[in-house]
Amino acid sequence: MKAADIRNLDSNQIHNKIAELKAELFNLRFQHAVGQLENTARLRTVKKTIAQMKTIISERGE
């Protein structure tokens, strides 16, 4: 998800999306530890998206 797309969302939607991504990140880390994760780049992408969303929220002053 691009930063411009994130900026178009309202704060509640961003917070909900962060919660979804954190759950996905938990599952990806578990799969990675077990050795079942095929797309390891997805870990980095999810973490980066969460960071972008948190940055946009802090820019808004919330």
Swiss-Prot record:
Protein keywords: Ribonucleoprotein, Ribosomal protein
Gene Ontology CC annotations of this record: cytosolic large ribosomal subunit
GO MF annotation: an example: structural constituent of ribosome
Biological processes annotated in GO: translation
Gene3D superfamilies, alphabetized: 1.10.287.310
SUPFAM superfamilies from the UniProt entry: Ribosomal protein L29 (L29p) (SSF46561)
The family this protein is said to belong to: Belongs to the universal ribosomal protein uL29 family.
Alphabetical list of NCBIfam families matching this protein: L29 (TIGR00012)
Protein name: Large ribosomal subunit protein uL29
Organism: Acholeplasma laidlawii (strain PG-8A)
